[in-house]
Amino acid sequence: MKKAVVLLSGGLDSATCLAIARDQGYACHTIAFDYGQRTRSELDAAERVSGVLGALSHRVIELGMGNIGGSALTDHSIEVPENGGDGIPVTYVPARNTVFLSLALGLAEVIDAQAIFIGVNAVDYSGYPDCRPAFIEAFQSMATLATKAGVEGRPMQIETPLMHLSKAQIIQRGVALGLDYGLTVSCYQADDHGNACGKCDSCRLRSQGFEDALVKDPTNYQ
């Protein structure tokens, strides 16, 4: 059976990615990152989603990105904004997806996976530069050059099935695949029980997505 590594944050998008990868016939191995983020409950959500959707393995990789700072998600001295603004927001974590994908690439090579799934999106998103198609295309080129599998003509494919979908379309796709979004945590500052603030940009996008999809929002709010 073909294998895939799925980056799993515990949020709505990455959970949908896992459901899609499974539906496409991949034996899935999930990977989450403890990078010093505010929302610790998202790691619990990632483990929960991985188990319910039948991933063959789940790994949590510890990273010290909080030591770098520069983001409201890793530096508690920077407040999480309640409204989206112009430009790249302070919730952007410098180089996060580059680091995450690099580690997922290493795992994929070790387990001989054919694909890496990541839930980046360029429609209903916060404007992060490492969620754009151009970034994924560049990383794909790098991955082909930088790995034994790529050099030997077996490059791993970076799969981004959500890239051009609206949040409502993502939710509808997940619901069609039987995904329970009550398992997920998307909030930038959820409490230890996964209850969402209802005010941050991630909460706004999630809530609007359920409304537009005509699907009941299962999110628990503080």
Curated annotation (Swiss-Prot):
GO terms of molecular function: ATP binding; ligase activity, forming carbon-nitrogen bonds; zinc ion binding
Biological function: Catalyzes the ATP-dependent conversion of 7-carboxy-7-deazaguanine (CDG) to 7-cyano-7-deazaguanine (preQ(0)).
Record has GTP-binding as a keyword: no
Binding site for Zn(2+): 187, 197, 200, 203
Keywords: ATP-binding, Ligase, Metal-binding, Nucleotide-binding, Queuosine biosynthesis, Zinc
UniProt cofactor(s): Zn(2+)
Protein's UniProt name: 7-cyano-7-deazaguanine synthase
Cofactor binding notes: Binds 1 zinc ion per subunit.
This protein's record includes keyword Metal-binding: yes
Binding site for ATP: 8-18
Catalytic activity, reaction form: 7-carboxy-7-deazaguanine + NH4(+) + ATP = 7-cyano-7-deazaguanine + ADP + phosphate + H2O + H(+)
Enzyme class: ligase
EC number from the UniProt entry: 6.3.4.20
Source domain of life: Bacteria
NCBIfam families (UniProt xref): 7-cyano-7-deazaguanine synthase QueC
Family: Belongs to the QueC family.
Pfam families: QueC (PF06508)
Pathway stated in the Swiss-Prot or TrEMBL entry: Purine metabolism; 7-cyano-7-deazaguanine biosynthesis
GO BP term, pick one: queuosine biosynthetic process
Provenance organism: Alcanivorax borkumensis (strain ATCC 700651 / DSM 11573 / NCIMB 13689 / SK2)
